Amino acid sequence: QALLEYFISKAHENSIVLFPHSRVVIGIPSGATEVEKRAVYDAAMAAGARETYMILEPAAAAIGAGLPIESDMGNMIVDVGGGTTEVAIISAGGIVISRSLRVAGDELDQDIIEYIRSKYNLFIGEQMAEKVKIAIGSAYPLNEEKTVDVRGRNLITGLPEAIEISSIEIREALSPSIQVIIDTIKDALDESPPEILADLMDNGICLTGGTAQLQGLVERLSNEVRVRVWVAEDPMTCVARGCGMVLDDLDLYENLLVGIERDPYTNTQG
């Protein structure tokens, strides 16, 4: 809620209206429960929003990536963020199939932490793990493998220690979680109607989210699912851009807005 209050207040700073009328569009995971949806809605209202709308993150990502979601042709979006990976197939302005899993960038950081702890008896923090992931993390063999120095605390001696670790090792650490994402994509493809599957073979799979930039992820996915995979422009901001586009034209995207059950408020969702 504090974060929402900050952004809403920032939006008000340049307002010339004495009592600004804030409208907010928030992206939520497709696996969010009714309780979680209500919590997000209530937090936004308590933070100062006057109208709060919610949209599933994969739909927002697809809009922000510029996919023709209103077309009858099927499009697939895979949004690999920090906390969740959202897999969705969209056609004719609606979500045909969606999957949400809590395996994404944060989980990859934990994979690195656990791998280094197990193999080297070295404890590193989340920031160091993320730096390693960005520097040498990969999902597919690199043309030139890399190494990086990692600093942490030796779990046996309790003393600071530095080791050199390779991109091959980090790829090994990340591989199980990457495979979970791949299997989820395969499951969604297996459930797709034949006509939509044909569209996906033509259109490919669009990757968004910060983790979409992981080295070799496109190659690994393409090889495993046998469908062309491509990364959207500025993938990290696709969900935010999509939410902004929805806010600018709520009528156009009305069918993609997410309602909440038993809404006591009269001015928005319900």
Q: Where are the language model's segments positioned?
A:
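Nucleotide/phosphate-binding catalytic cleft detector across ATP-hydrolyzing
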Residues: 1-80, 88-205, 212-270
